[in-house]
Amino acid sequence: MEKNIYHCPLCNYRGELLSFRGRPYAQCPNCLSLERHRFQYQILQKVLHDKNTKLMHALHFAPEPGLKAFFNHRFAKYVTADIAMSDVDINIDIQALPFADETFDFVFASHVLEHIPDDHKALFEIRRILKPQGMAILPVPIVVASTIEYPEPDPLQDNHVRAPGLDYYERYADYFSSCQFYSSEEVDAECQPFVYIGENYSHPLRVDECQMKDIIPVCYR
């Protein structure tokens, strides 16, 4: 049987990928990156390639190990943050950030806002601490057509307080001057940026009978 060989851009591994939570071809066995991490890495390379990041200050919420290493070597100042994680620089609530206005050039918070009760307050705070022309990358898992707000955190969904829909990113227009959206279909398929789903699973970002794409919003103050 022919093997599916992929390339992980985060660690340069080349070979088969592991299943993760029932999703085939999901996890790199070397650095443990998932589909979204490999997709995000390629978009980060694209949007940062013409930036002098050695002069930029960055804030990274809920830092992913592979991306943490990438950011740490790139930015002049790099701060990791989370409300509960112990191995970060500072424990803070994204709804009430302790930083002065216009502190950071770059903010990265992936799969964070679906956990935040007042995501509008969080978006306000992110914009507040961004410098003029600052950039924020704020992807969430799009799982339905229209966003559903839960009355309380759902323990079966890692305590998500909402199911983000195709309309979710419309909220960003109230806080940022512009947003660019990137799709899994725009990057090298060899990194395997798609999520494999069952044939009977309805998803608004399905691209064929077994794959769904992801979307990354890159927001500018």
Task: Describe the residue ranges of each PLM region.
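Hydrophobic adenine-recognition pocket in adenosine-nucleotide-binding enzymes
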Residues: A109-V112, I142
